[in-house]
Amino acid sequence: MLSFIARRLGLLIPTFFGVTLLTFALIRLIPGDPVEVMMGERRVDPQMHAEALHRLGLDKPLYQQYLDYVGNLAQGNLGESLTTREGVWHEFLTLFPATLELSLAAMLFAGTFGLLAGVIAALKRGSLFDHGVMTVSLAGYSMPIFWWGLILIMLFSVSLGWTPVSGRLDLLYDIEPKTGFMLIDTLLSDEQGSFLDAVRHLILPAIVLGTIPLAVIARMTRSAMLEVLREDYVRTARAKGLSPARVVFVHALRNALIPVLTVFGLQVGTLLAGAVLTETIFSWPGIGKWLIDAISRRDYPVVQNGILLVATLVILVNFVVDILYGLANPRIRHQR
């Protein structure tokens, strides 16, 4: 197992450097002068223009810019925002709990209902429920997030008034941000009703963000269950007279979860990409909205290093999933 982990760690280093190079190149491939883009329509004095280029290090050769960039990363220096003058790392840590809370709620929604729908669809193969799950999952996977979010807002927030339209908490509550996780902070506070209000604010964004992962998990679970149910050990378990529930949940589902676990890891990238739109639609103060606001303000350091941090997070999560996959499937550990 240690050699398996070492091999996976060995792949992290070139992957990370590839991400830094890609991030560095993409920012510099944007058309136009970065300083003029950041200044917008304001006229820029040549001296101020030169000072801005020097401050950003953009007056150096590209290779030197990249070496400086990697050197600053090695020192933990991600620069500071051009608009707030706060450190990029500080802003990321401040806003990350909001995105993590939303992502965990979305994965809880997707995992619970996706696994349940996939298992039942496999057990009732060819039934109306099975066809319904396949159709709905295909629609959920194909549905644009922004359109789905607006539909739910119109229905549950505007028409029925069941859920709030935006934000994480009603302005009536004044909660001290101890952890950054609103559900935890409201539980720790003395303000009655704040926790339920935080849950109401979380429901719609979590459903919107979790719809695509739910569709993928449901289809993958159904496919994996159908394959496992045809295995000899499942037939043997049935022949021994084991209860249907024990056959399904102990013998079949446990083995079917191995490929589903991989899908969970792959959905992290989907969640972070979807969070950009979801947080913008619901004015959710997380990493996605932070990056969108930085792009609109032409905040060069935030865009560059924010994208790098998100990409690094995806790499680390996939690394953890690889390790869990190796623990669940010994054959993977011994592959060279």
Swiss-Prot record:
Residues 96-325 form the ABC transmembrane type-1 domain. GO terms for molecular function: dipeptide transmembrane transporter activity. Disruption phenotype: Deletion of the dppBCDF operon leads to reduced ability to utilize di/tripeptides as nitrogen source. It comes from the Bacteria. It is a multi-pass membrane protein. Keywords: Cell inner membrane, Cell membrane, Membrane, Peptide transport, Protein transport, Transmembrane, Transmembrane helix, Transport. The chain crosses the membrane at residues 10-30, 102-122, 145-165, 198-218, 257-277, 307-327. It is found in: Cell inner membrane. GO terms for cellular component: plasma membrane. InterPro entries: BPD_transp_1_N, MetI-like, MetI-like_sf. GO terms for biological process: protein transport. The keyword Cell inner membrane applies. The keyword Ribonucleoprotein does not apply. Pfam families: BPD_transp_1, BPD_transp_1_N. Its main location: membrane. Part of the ABC transporter DppABCDF involved in the uptake of various di/tripeptides. Is also involved in the uptake of phaseolotoxin, a toxic tripeptide inhibiting the enzyme ornithine carbamoyltransferase. Responsible for the translocation of the substrate across the membrane. Belongs to the binding-protein-dependent transport system permease family. OppBC subfamily. The complex is composed of two ATP-binding proteins (DppD and DppF), two transmembrane proteins (DppB and DppC) and a solute-binding protein (DppA1-A5). Five orthologous SBPs (DppA1-A5) are present in P.aeruginosa, which increases the substrate specificity of the DppBCDF transporter. This is Di/tripeptide transport system permease protein DppB. It comes from Pseudomonas aeruginosa (strain UCBPP-PA14).
